Design a protein with these regions (language model features):
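A short, Lys/Arg-rich alpha-helix, primarily the initiator
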Residues: 1-16, 23
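Short, charged amphipathic recognition helices of the HTH superfamily
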Residues: 15-18, 45
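Append "Primarily bacterial transcriptional regulators
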Residues: 20-21, 31
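Alpha-helical residues within the helix-turn-helix
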Residues: 22, 51
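Recognition helix of helix-turn-helix/homeodomain-like DNA-binding domains
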Residues: 26-41
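Short, basic-rich loop-to-helix N-cap that marks the start of a DNA-contacting helix
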Residues: 38-50
Length: 66
């Protein structure tokens, strides 16, 4: 997973981690742990993040499956 690209995408979309956490139904602290590689992002969470950040399929594949 390319966490730096994911973090850049969050900023690019003008969102904070708290805003993204709300959008995907997670606690902010949980999302912070996932973004700092202490916990894995699940497939379901990746799908919700993809929608919240308006990613194309190609962007999501590049970020989550690389």
């Amino acid at each position: 997973m390319k966490l730096n690209k994911l973090k850049a995408r969050i900023i690019e979309k003008g969102m904070s981690v708290e805003m993204l956490a709300d959008a995907i139904g997670k606690e902010r602290s949980t999302l912070y742990r996932k973004l700092n590689n202490f916990e894995k992002i699940t497939i379901g969470e990746a799908a919700k993040i993809k929608v919240a950040l308006e990613m194309t399929d190609e962007d999501a594949i590049d970020i989550f499956l690389s």
